[in-house]
C-alpha cells in the first residue's frame, strides 16, 4: 500500500456540497493500488455510550489519470454536518485514513481524528445559473459575421470576404448583420451567443477599448444592441458580452491624460506606472497586457478605477438585460475585485453567467464567490491533440481528461465553457488537416460531453484558417460554398443533445478504459438511475470490432443517431467502420 499517494482535503474539489443537500467526498490513491475504498462518516455530535456512531458507504472509482485513481461517495447528512474518514484496502492490508494519519481501525473515542465538513451553508454552495447547463453557445467575432448595414462601415472597408483577414483590415460586420441571421442560429439549435468586444475601439477585434460605455459606431448603436438582445430573447437565445477589465486601450481617455500630463494627471494612479516620463518602446515602463504598450493595465485596487469598472459591469446588465459577461485575461485581475464584481452584477440579475478567460488550473476562481465558469482550454488542448495533431493515444486522452475533471467539483464541470476553436486559435478544421471526418468526430465529443459547448462561428460549415488573424475570416453565407453535410451533422448533434438530457449534464460521465495503448476507440458513458447512453468514437481509418459489456445477458439498445433498435448479447462486438461513431442508449 502506497500510503504516501493517498490524499484528501476537506474542501474544494475533494469535499463539496450540492444544491440538493448531498455532500460529494473524494479521495485520491495511487493508480491500481487499492481494491476498494470505503467512506466512514457520521454526525459530529452523535455518540452512543461515549463512542462516536458512524456509517459506511462504498466509494466508486470515478477515474484514473497517469498516476492516481479517484474515488467518490455521495452522502446526505441529516443535520448538514459531517465527520468522516476512509478505509482503504489494497487486497493485502486494510487501514483507516483520517486527518491525523493512519489507524488499524476507525477511531471511535475522539472525533477530532476525522476530517470535518462543519456545516453546509447555503451561501457557500457553488451554483452556476441552471440555464447554462442546457445551452449550446455560438461565438461571434462581430466584424466578420455579417454586414447588415453598410452605412456604418468604417473607411477602407473591403468587399465581404474579398481578401484574407489581416490584423488591421475591415469587412463591415456589425450587429444588424447578426439580427438578419438569427433564423440561421435558431435553426442550428443555438441557445446563447458569446460576442467578442463590441465597445468603442480602433481595432477590428475591439480588445483595445477606448470607451466602455459606448458601442463602436461600426457595429451600430445602443438601440441596435437593444434590438438585437430583444430579438435573441424572443428566439430563446441568451447574449453574453466580452469585457476587458485587466487593461484598457492606449486611446482610453484617462490613459491619454496620463500620456499628455505625466505625473500631474489625475489619472496617473489608475495604472501601474513605474516612473515618469512614460516610455512605450522597446518595452513600456508601465504594466501592460504582456509587453503590449497599447494595452496599459488597470490598477483595480484604486477605488476610482474599481467603481468605474463595476459600473461598466452593472450598466450593460441593468440597461440592456445581457445574460452573461465573459471576462478577458481574468487571471491577472485581483480576486478581491472579482468578488465585488460578482456581488454587484448578481444583485441586478441573479442568474447572470460570469465566465473567466483562464487557461490553467482555475480552482481559486471557482469557489462560488467569483466566476461561474472558465473557458475550458485543457479540454480544447486534449481534443486537438487527440483528433487533430494525433499526438496522444486514446489512453493518454482519457488519463489527461480524468485529471482535468477531478481538478474541479462536478458542479463546476457542468458549467465549464467547452470549446475547440476561438478567435485566438487556428480553425479546428485546419488543425485537423482539413479532414472533415475527423472534425465530425470532434463535434461528437464536444456536443456529448459534460459542460456547456461553444461553436466558433463558421466551424459548423467548414471555415479554415491559421493562427490569428487567419482564424478570423468572413463568415461564408453562400450555401454553395458551405459544407452542408457538416452543417447538418452539427445540427443533428445539437438536436440530440437537446432531446436527451443525458447527452448534456444530467447523470454521470464515466470513461470506458481503452484496452491498450493502441486501442483507437474512445468510449464513455453518460448514465443515471434509469438509463445509460454510450458514445463510441473510432478514430482509426480501419474498421474495428468493439466489445460491449452489459449487466444483463441480453440488452436492447437504441442507436440514437439513426434510431435503429438492436438486441445485443453481453460480450458481443459491434462493428465501427473507419472514422465511425455510435451513440447508444440502453
Swiss-Prot record:
Binding site for Ca(2+): 147, 152-153, 172, 174
UniProt keyword Transport present: no
Organism domain of life: Bacteria
Site (Transition state stabilizer): 424
Alphabetized UniProt keyword annotations: Calcium, Carbohydrate metabolism, Glycosidase, Hydrolase, Metal-binding
Catalyzed reactions per annotation: hydrolysis of (1->4)-alpha-D-glucosidic linkages in polysaccharides so as to remove successive alpha-maltose residues from the non-reducing ends of the chains
Family named by the database record: Belongs to the glycosyl hydrolase 13 family.
InterPro entries per the UniProt record, alphabetical: Glyco_hydro_13_cat_dom (IPR006047), Glyco_hydro_13_lg-like_dom (IPR004185), Glyco_hydro_b (IPR013780), Glycoside_hydrolase_SF (IPR017853), Ig-like_fold (IPR013783), Malt_amylase-like_C (IPR032091), O16G_dom_2 (IPR045857)
Name of the protein this chain belongs to: Maltogenic alpha-amylase
Enzymatic class: hydrolase
Active site per UniProt: 328, 357
Pfam families, A to Z: Alpha-amylase (PF00128), Alpha-amylase_N (PF02903), Malt_amylase_C (PF16657)
GO MF annotation terms: glucan 1,4-alpha-maltohydrolase activity; metal ion binding
Entry binding sites for substrate: 247, 326, 423-424, 468, 472
Amino acid at each position: 500500500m502506497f500510503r504516501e499517494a493517498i490524499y484528501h482535503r476537506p474542501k474544494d474539489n475533494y469535499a463539496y456540497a450540492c444544491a440538493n443537500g448531498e455532500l460529494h467526498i473524494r479521495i485520491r490513491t495511487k493508480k491500481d493500488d487499492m481494491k476498494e475504498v470505503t467512506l466512514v462518516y457520521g454526525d459530529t455530535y452523535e455518540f452512543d455510550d461515549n463512542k462516536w456512531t458512524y456509517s459506511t458507504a462504498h466509494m466508486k472509482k470515478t477515474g484514473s489519470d497517469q498516476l492516481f485513481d479517484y474515488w467518490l461517495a455521495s452522502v446526505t447528512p441529516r443535520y448538514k454536518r459531517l465527520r468522516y474518514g476512509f478505509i482503504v484496502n489494497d487486497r493485502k492490508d486494510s487501514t483507516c485514513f483520517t486527518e491525523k494519519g493512519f489507524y488499524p481501525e476507525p477511531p471511535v473515542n475522539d472525533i477530532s481524528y476525522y476530517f470535518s465538513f462543519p456545516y453546509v451553508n447555503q451561501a457557500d454552495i457553488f451554483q452556476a445559473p441552471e440555464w447554462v447547463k442546457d445551452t449550446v453557445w455560438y461565438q461571434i467575432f462581430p466584424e466578420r459575421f455579417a454586414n447588415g448595414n453598410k452605412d456604418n462601415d468604417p473607411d477602407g472597408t473591403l468587399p465581404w470576404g474579398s481578401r484574407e483577414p489581416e490584423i488591421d483590415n475591415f469587412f463591415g460586420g456589425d450587429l444588424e448583420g447578426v439580427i438578419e441571421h438569427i433564423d440561421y442560429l435558431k435553426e442550428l439549435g443555438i441557445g446563447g451567443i458569446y460576442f467578442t468586444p463590441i465597445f468603442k475601439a480602433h481595432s477590428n477585434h475591439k480588445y483595445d477599448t477606448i470607451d466602455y460605455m459606448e458601442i463602436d459606431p461600426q457595429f451600430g448603436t445602443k438601440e441596435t444592441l437593444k434590438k438585437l438582445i430583444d430579438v435573441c430573447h424572443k428566439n430563446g437565445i441568451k447574449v453574453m458580452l466580452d469585457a476587458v477589465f485587466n487593461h484598457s486601450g492606449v486611446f482610453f481617455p484617462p490613459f491619454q491624460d496620463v500620456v499628455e500630463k505625466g505625473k500631474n494627471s489625475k489619472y496617473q494612479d489608475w495604472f501601474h506606472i513605474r516612473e515618469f516620463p512614460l516610455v512605450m518602446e522597446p518595452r513600456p515602463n508601465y504594466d501592460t497586457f504582456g509587453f503590449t504598450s497599447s494595452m496599459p493595465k488597470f490598477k483595480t485596487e484604486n477605488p476610482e478605477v474599481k467603481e468605474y469598472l463595476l459600473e461598466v459591469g452593472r450598466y450593460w446588465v441593468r440597461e440592456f438585460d445581457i445574460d452573461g459577461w465573459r471576462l478577458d485575461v481574468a487571471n491577472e485581475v485581483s480576486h478581491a475585485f472579482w468578488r465585488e464584481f460578482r456581488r454587484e452584477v448578481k444583485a441586478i440579475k441573479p442568474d447572470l453567467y460570469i465566465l473567466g478567460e483562464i487557461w490553467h488550473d482555475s480552482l481559486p476562481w471557482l469557489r462560488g464567490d467569483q466566476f461561474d465558469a472558465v473557458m475550458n482550454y485543457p479540454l480544447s488542448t486534449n481534443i486537438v491533440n487527440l483528433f487533430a495533431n494525433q499526438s496522444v493515444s486514446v489512453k493518454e486522452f482519457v488519463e489527461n481528461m480524468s485529471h482535468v475533471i477531478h481538478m474541479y467539483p462536478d458542479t463546476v464541470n457542468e458549467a465549464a465553457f467547452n470549446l475547440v476553436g476561438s478567435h485566438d486559435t487556428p480553425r479546428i478544421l485546419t488543425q485537423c488537416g482539413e479532414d472533415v471526418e475527423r472534425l465530425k468526430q470532434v463535434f461528437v465529443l464536444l456536443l456529448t460531453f459534460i459542460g456547456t459547448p461553444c461553436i466558433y462561428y463558421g466551424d459548423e460549415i467548414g471555415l479554415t484558417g491559421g493562427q490569428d488573424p487567419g482564424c478570423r475570416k468572413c463568415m461564408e453565407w453562400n450555401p454553395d460554398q458551405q459544407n452542408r453535410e457538416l452543417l447538418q451533422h452539427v445540427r443533428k448533434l445539437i438536436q440530440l443533445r437537446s432531446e436527451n438530457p443525458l447527452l448534456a449534464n444530467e447523470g454521470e460521465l464515466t470513461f470506458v478504459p481503452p484496452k491498450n495503448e493502441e486501442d483507437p476507440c474512445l468510449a464513455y458513458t453518460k448514465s443515471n438511475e434509469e438509463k445509460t447512453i454510450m458514445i463510441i468514437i473510432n478514430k482509426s481509418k480501419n474498421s474495428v470490432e468493439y466489445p460491449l459489456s452489459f449487466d444483463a445477458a441480453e440488452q436492447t439498445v437504441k442507436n440514437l443517431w439513426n434510431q435503429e433498435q438492436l438486441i445485443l448479447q453481453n460480450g458481443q462486438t459491434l462493428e465501427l467502420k473507419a472514422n465511425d461513431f455510435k451513440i447508444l442508449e440502453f
